[in-house]
């Protein structure tokens, strides 16, 4: 299949507003809303809607395409198509969705795929998702001990596997098996089928956290801890709604592989690894997790070093001009300035007043390492090491920037790509 060329006028940028009203909207998202020719939005609180309307004069509410009993897939098709019609007219369109615009959102992904296939510029900007809020509010780390995330109906239909050693997050638990829409909410009559599966995997006594992220600044999140068995009782399941999420903590902790620990040389020779104990802090939602104390011998030793601490030789303090700070901020928050810079690095760099020579060179090069060297006070030893590794990469044909080993000075030697 021939790849379309990106030479058409018109573009589509998909952004997210986060979950909590207004405050979780990123600066990047706001800048694209303000710069758009036309904005389409689908948000769940009126304060965010009103805020969007103050940032652009041409806004359309996508929520109007929902209706009682109407297939959500039909709605999603219509939402994506009304955005695409304006892109095809040559407009720079922004689609705004609550949360992260690509997490449990269909019309955004559909519109992006079609726009790209037709040769238009199209991209998605990240936003704060309900899962991000859950991590923060429940104070859990998805990397420890890993995390599974499913949509509740899909979890049942496709018999998705669980992992009792990891965090488990289930979305859309308040509309199990429901494919249409209702302005008044969902009856959720198939909820018991989900409970059956959870009991089979974890047992009736295992904890489950009923979670709802705060949507308004003055609200607190819902973090009710129940047991899976309690989900069968009306007192509990009637509190599960369309924005409810379940978090199920690990049932057990998997022991480490001692042979792999030794092969990776994680511990000094002769030291026996602890196969069960977890680092501090423990997961407050998980039963019976053996955890080291907050202040053990290692922690006390580390804290004792604070009073005599000095920055290490390879620490890189900031050393940049106001002009460079301003231009980097402009590139981050002004889509039109960013487009100018991407079109011609050198011309843009030459147009910016009051830069140092190294800052201007970094702008012309456009490489992250060049920016770092121009904006940080770089120790000679670090630059020498970087120069050696980059020269080796350049010899192998990689398009690296070569940095000369002088503190704060960037060489503009660029190998051919």
From Swiss-Prot:
<dbReference type="InterPro" id="IPR000878">
    <property type="entry name" value="4pyrrol_Mease"/>
</dbReference>
<feature type="active site">
    <location>
        <position position="76"/>
    </location>
</feature>
<feature type="binding site">
    <location>
        <position position="244"/>
    </location>
    <ligand>
        <name>S-adenosyl-L-methionine</name>
    </ligand>
</feature>
<feature type="region of interest" description="Precursor leader">
    <location>
        <begin position="379"/>
        <end position="399"/>
    </location>
</feature>
<feature type="modified residue" description="N-methylisoleucine">
    <location>
        <position position="401"/>
    </location>
</feature>
<dbReference type="InterPro" id="IPR035996">
    <property type="entry name" value="4pyrrol_Methylase_sf"/>
</dbReference>
<feature type="binding site">
    <location>
        <position position="98"/>
    </location>
    <ligand>
        <name>S-adenosyl-L-methionine</name>
    </ligand>
</feature>
<feature type="region of interest" description="Clasp domain">
    <location>
        <begin position="252"/>
        <end position="378"/>
    </location>
</feature>
<feature type="binding site">
    <location>
        <position position="103"/>
    </location>
    <ligand>
        <name>S-adenosyl-L-methionine</name>
    </ligand>
</feature>
<comment type="similarity">
    <text>In the N-terminal section; belongs to the precorrin methyltransferase family.</text>
</comment>
<feature type="modified residue" description="N-methylglycine">
    <location>
        <position position="408"/>
    </location>
</feature>
<feature type="binding site">
    <location>
        <position position="213"/>
    </location>
    <ligand>
        <name>S-adenosyl-L-methionine</name>
    </ligand>
</feature>
<comment type="function">
    <text>Fusion protein of the methyltransferase ledM and the lentinulin A core peptide; part of the gene cluster that mediates the biosynthesis of lentinulin A, a highly methylated cyclic dodecapeptide with nematodicidal activity. Lentinulin A derives from the C-terminus of the ledMA protein, and it is the ledMA protein that methylates its own C-terminus using S-adenosyl methionine (SAM). The C-terminus is subsequently cleaved off and macrocyclized by the prolyloligopeptidase ledP to give the final product.</text>
</comment>
<feature type="active site">
    <location>
        <position position="72"/>
    </location>
</feature>
<keyword id="KW-0843">Virulence</keyword>
<feature type="modified residue" description="N-methylglycine">
    <location>
        <position position="411"/>
    </location>
</feature>
<feature type="modified residue" description="N-methylglycine">
    <location>
        <position position="405"/>
    </location>
</feature>
<feature type="binding site">
    <location>
        <position position="130"/>
    </location>
    <ligand>
        <name>S-adenosyl-L-methionine</name>
    </ligand>
</feature>
<feature type="modified residue" description="N-methylvaline">
    <location>
        <position position="413"/>
    </location>
</feature>
<feature type="modified residue" description="N-methylvaline">
    <location>
        <position position="410"/>
    </location>
</feature>
<protein>
    <recommendedName>
        <fullName>Methyltransferase/ribosomally synthesized cyclic peptide lentinulin A precursor ledMA</fullName>
        <ecNumber>2.1.1.-</ecNumber>
    </recommendedName>
</protein>
<dbReference type="GO" id="GO:0008168">
    <property type="term" value="F:methyltransferase activity"/>
</dbReference>
<keyword id="KW-0808">Transferase</keyword>
<keyword id="KW-0949">S-adenosyl-L-methionine</keyword>
<comment type="pathway">
    <text>Mycotoxin biosynthesis.</text>
</comment>
<feature type="active site">
    <location>
        <position position="98"/>
    </location>
</feature>
<dbReference type="Pfam" id="PF00590">
    <property type="entry name" value="TP_methylase"/>
</dbReference>
<feature type="region of interest" description="Methyltransferase domain">
    <location>
        <begin position="1"/>
        <end position="251"/>
    </location>
</feature>
<feature type="binding site">
    <location>
        <position position="100"/>
    </location>
    <ligand>
        <name>S-adenosyl-L-methionine</name>
    </ligand>
</feature>
<feature type="binding site">
    <location>
        <position position="172"/>
    </location>
    <ligand>
        <name>S-adenosyl-L-methionine</name>
    </ligand>
</feature>
<comment type="subunit">
    <text>Homodimer.</text>
</comment>
<dbReference type="GO" id="GO:0032259">
    <property type="term" value="P:methylation"/>
</dbReference>
<feature type="binding site">
    <location>
        <position position="245"/>
    </location>
    <ligand>
        <name>S-adenosyl-L-methionine</name>
    </ligand>
</feature>
<keyword id="KW-0488">Methylation</keyword>
<dbReference type="InterPro" id="IPR014777">
    <property type="entry name" value="4pyrrole_Mease_sub1"/>
</dbReference>
<feature type="modified residue" description="N-methylvaline">
    <location>
        <position position="406"/>
    </location>
</feature>
<feature type="modified residue" description="N-methylvaline">
    <location>
        <position position="404"/>
    </location>
</feature>
<feature type="modified residue" description="N-methylvaline">
    <location>
        <position position="407"/>
    </location>
</feature>
<keyword id="KW-0489">Methyltransferase</keyword>
<feature type="modified residue" description="N-methylvaline">
    <location>
        <position position="403"/>
    </location>
</feature>
